[in-house]
Amino acid sequence: MKKLLISFIRFYQIFISPLKPPTCRFYPTCSHYGLEAVKRFGAIKGGWLTIKRILKCHPFHPGGFDPVPEKQENGKS
């Protein structure tokens, strides 16, 4: 499932994104955020983080720097 999500995001980056003007108000862009989130957290949590990020991408949100959260190690505070 992780590879499938990564394939969808890469397809978007290669074939769809170049056809649109650059409008992402975040850094990293939503597609780069999605790739990193899925690679770091897997399909379910990474997919959820990506969906939350895309829902914030609208004209009324200021945008800015919004990196993927660091993965927490078990047993460490």
Swiss-Prot record:
Keyword DNA damage: no
Name under which the protein is recorded: Putative membrane protein insertion efficiency factor
PANTHER family: MEMBRANE PROTEIN INSERTION EFFICIENCY FACTOR-RELATED
Entry's family note: Belongs to the UPF0161 family.
InterPro entries in alphabetical order: Membr_insert_effic_factor_YidD (IPR002696)
Keyword Cell membrane: yes
Major place of residence: membrane
